[in-house]
Amino acid sequence: EIAQCLVGSEMCIRDSTWSACKGVVSCAAGIALDEGLIRLDEKIVDIFPEYAPENPEGYLGDVTLENMLTMTTGLESSLFFCDWPERYTTPDWIRYFFENAKVIKKPGTEWLYSNFNTYMISCAIEKRAGVNLLEYLRNRFFEPLGIGNPDWTLCPKGHVHAANGLYVNIDEFTRYGQMILHKGNYNGKQLVPESYMKMATSNLVDNSAAGSPGNLYSGFGYGYQFVMNPEAGSYRSDGNYGQFCLAFPDKDAVVTVMSLEGDFQKIGNHLWTTVVPEL
């Protein structure tokens, strides 16, 4: 286990995990599936009939929760999120999705990263559970991991951002890493069904579009909100500004990094040239 923290900061200081918390939403989906609250093949229009158009355009009516988990919704574009201007003028993000999502490709056929996929998965769980995702996971997930009263940014309607906005410290982030390393098990307690975690952390879809020149670690596949590493069988949660939680089951190792580095590819490349070879 290797934990690297912010220079000049204390281990107890919480900071944003940015998109690395997408893996937490995936874990929530696994728990909700096990409890019978949702199904992978459920269509998003059926979960939110009060929002869905009567005659969905394109392939919108075919989009399932599994498509959203794998980022293969078929969207034309990623839609807004985080600090995009629309965030400040849009009071209802679920309504925005159904009014603006152009699903031009058959769901399940092509990967396109969109924070809205994660947000809608979370909202579906919240609707079925009757509480927001933070409360749903409090006793089922966060407390067993020793993550007490975590902070998660809310949208104007009170739903967690889901795709980002979860604040933890690096010690808590590392415990999350231990849990994903052991396929949902932490300290002998199975928090997320093992069968689900095996699927979630498998290479399910081609995300080579995420690769870029000079990037040593992206574009090697995608699972249920988890990103595949170049090394076979290893995977991660990662986020903007250099948040990394890397799991290497064959080495029984977790590497966690939290940073505020604008050029987060520099951190990723450093991990794969300096840290990973030493595991």
Regions inferred by a protein language model and the residue ranges of each:
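Single conserved hydrophobic/aromatic residue that forms the stacking wall/gate
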Residues: 1-8, 13
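Active-site-proximal alpha-helical segments within enzyme catalytic domains
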Residues: 117-124, 164-185, 243-259
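Active-site SXXK
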Residues: 16-41, 68, 121-125, 173-179
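Active-site helix/loop module of the DD-peptidase/beta-lactamase fold
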Residues: 35-73, 102, 129-164, 168
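Active-site Gly/Thr loop motif
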Residues: 147-149, 198-254
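Soluble non-cytosolic domains of exported or imported proteins
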Residues: 15, 19, 23, 38, ...
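Structured C-terminal helix/loop/strand segments within mature extracytoplasmic catalytic/sensor domains
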Residues: 237-279
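A small/polar active-site loop signature that marks catalytic segments
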Residues: 74-154
